[in-house]
Every structure is written in C-alpha cells, then in structure tokens.
Amino acid sequence: MSFASDCKDEASTIKDMPGHCKMASLEAMLRLNSEIVRTNGHFIITFLSANSHVAVYFMRLIKDLYDAQMELLTKEATKFLKKKTYEVVINSQCETIINDMNLFLNESPNHLDYESRECCKKSYLRGAFLARGSVNDPARSDYHLEIATRNNIEAIYIQRLMNSFDLNAKISKRRNDIIIYIKEIASITDFLRIIGVSQMVFKLEELQIQREFKNDLNRKVNSEIANGFKTLDAANQQLANIQCLEYNYPLEKMDPKILLIMKVRKDHPDSSFKELLEILNNDYGENITKSG
C-alpha cells in the first residue's frame, strides 16, 4: 500500500459529521470524479475509484443523504486499466442529487455555503482528496500533494479553500487536467491534518524527525572534520532528538544504521562528531560518509 492510499483509507473512516459536512464531501467527490448519463429517460450517476474504502465511503454518504439505490461493480486490472477499479452506480434519486448540487453547471451556489463554515471547507477538501488527490511517499525528498480536476472554476475554488488555511496552494496544467498542488512539507502536513488523517500526520512527522536527525548528523560531522571543534549544544540537541524518537516511534521500524548512531551518541554524550566517526568505524565497522 502507498502512503497516499493509507491517507485515503484513514480519511474514509471519518463518520461523525453533520449533514452539511456530508453534503460538502459528497459534492466534491461528485464534481471531481463522477459521470452522469441519461438512459431510457432516467439519469444514472457513476463514481469511480481505485480504492475500495473510498468507494464504500461514497456509498455511505449517498445512503445517509439520499437513501438511493446503488450497486458496486468491480473492474479487474488490464493492460489498459492499470489498477483494479471500483464503480459505484446510483440508480435512483439521481435527478434530486443533480439538482441539489447543480452538477450540470460549472459553478454551484452551494460553494458559498461551504465557505461560510470551516468544518464544511475541511469536508469539501477531504472529498476532493478522496476523489482525485494524491501525495508522494514522505520517504522521498520531493514532497508533493495534489488534487486534479478538469474544470478551471473548480480548480480555483479548491485553491481558494486550501489557501484559506494558508497552505500556499498553486495551480498548473498537466495534459487534460488542472492540478492544484502544494510542495512545502509543513503545508502538506497541515493539509492532512485538516482533512482528519491524524495517524498519517503522526507518521509523516516521525519520518521528518528521522530525516532531520540524520541530515543534522551529517552536517555536523562535516563541520567537525572541517573545523576541528566540538559543539556541546549540538550534542545535546542530538540527544533530545533521540529521546523524542525513542518515546514516539516504533524503533523496530527504523534504519539499523540510525539506531546504531543513536546508541553511540547516548554512550558518548560528550564526544565530538569526529570522535563519534572514529568509534563507529573502529568499534562497529561503520564508515559514515557525507551522504550518510
């Protein structure tokens, strides 16, 4: 499972919402990833997702708000369809849903109602992310979270919602899609917190602590080799970071090299980074380079 899928799985578990927040999430999902067709004089709405939890979440919203008849279809992966896909087909109440949300129009008066409530803004962003959002694995250094749409008015609206939370969201074009994206790790963390995925926020923050610890160690090692002095304040900061990791993060999931560095630092709290390098090399056979 990818980090983005895990985020969507957690967001799909959120149930305790008032009706107006459910409407906000549902409208976002319909606007970004649904298709409306007319068959034998009746409308049918379909919603597609590669995530089963998202499909079930969508069905729950429809059931709670409209008690409509639905069916869930599964499409297996093929060479043309890269992932297994879940299709929700709404067979009743479609005209009511379409009229309530003005889905045949490029813009909806409901948008103004959502903006008047912070809870609805968060719910709309949650629905948009579930429908067509993605986020890079935080283990990578190229931080990126995005929501895609094919409607320019919708893109501007989503950007406005995101930036009402100071996320510095920007818009770009990619083939047939308009992309609303954020790049800063702090903004990505805030966005995930806004849509309610607290467990994934915790995981993201722990990975950040690990990366900062390792990067800080490498910087200090290089500084010690170049300048030949030891900084006690830096060592104390390293010990504080180690204590934070040991208290908050499952150590069995950490890189063994990081665990070894943490142990050596705790065993030698007053040693310079140059001295730590020698201990790691002589006692443990670990050669730490500039790249770690």
Language-model regions: role of each:
Residues 1-43, 50-54, 72-82, 106, ...:
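Sequence-level preference for short, compositionally simple segments enriched
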